[in-house]
Regions:
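N-terminal hydrophobic/helix-forming segments and targeting peptides
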Residues: 1-183
Length: 183
């Protein structure tokens, strides 16, 4: 999702009858009241400036058309930044693992599953697991590198360049200690 605090002036693409570039906008800061300046703009208070007439927009855009951020991949030192990297990185890593295992003898069956709806209850993973009935599963995902200035020590669950993070528990799962130790 989007953090409404950072939407102003973000470039987006409206995926309507054709892709349309736009810029997120809201009331200009120099005409806002003091009260308006002191609060966070809600996502429904933004508009998208396409530079087109209202009639042209109505021809090309329907209610419900998806909107994505317009962001190119950039290199930042030895890191990269782009939109939607979390799931894409996990897919890349999983494909590379399967390539590395392709010609190796392993004493068990390995399934690589790419699933959907993780954020709303692991629906895709649940469906895949019920069809495969695995002895154990390893989920790949990303987490925050919270080694930022001002972060308290207990908030630093992982650090950039610190290696793989292995989850022990979250709000839905407590991982088996044997699996955690194995990994």
């Amino acid at each position: 999702g989007f953090d409404p605090k950072i939407l102003t002036a973000q470039r987006v693409i409206i995926h309507g009858r054709e892709d349309i570039l736009g810029v997120m906008g809201t009331i200009l800061i120099h005409v806002m009241t003091d009260e308006e300046r002191s609060k966070v703009t809600k996502s429904n208070e933004y508009f998208i400036d396409t530079g087109m007439s209202a009639d042209k927009v109505k021809q090309l855009v329907r209610i419900g058309d998806p909107i994505t951020r317009e962001r190119a991949l950039i290199e930042m030192g030895d890191c990269v930044n782009s939109k939607s990297l979390d799931n894409r990185i996990s897919v890349f890593v999983q494909i590379e693992v399967m390539k590395a295992l392709q010609n190796k003898e392993v004493p068990y069956d390995i399934y690589a599953v790419f699933t959907v709806q993780e954020e709303v209850g692991l629906r895709g993973a649940t469906a895949a697991a019920s069809g495969i009935d695995p002895d154990f599963g390893i989920a790949l995902d990303v987490t925050m590198a919270y080694d930022l200035p001002g972060a308290a020590a207990h908030e630093r669950i992982s650090s950039l360049h610190g290696g793989t993070a292995i989850k022990i528990m979250d709000g839905a799962t407590i991982c088996d200690y044997r699996m955690v130790e194995f990994m």
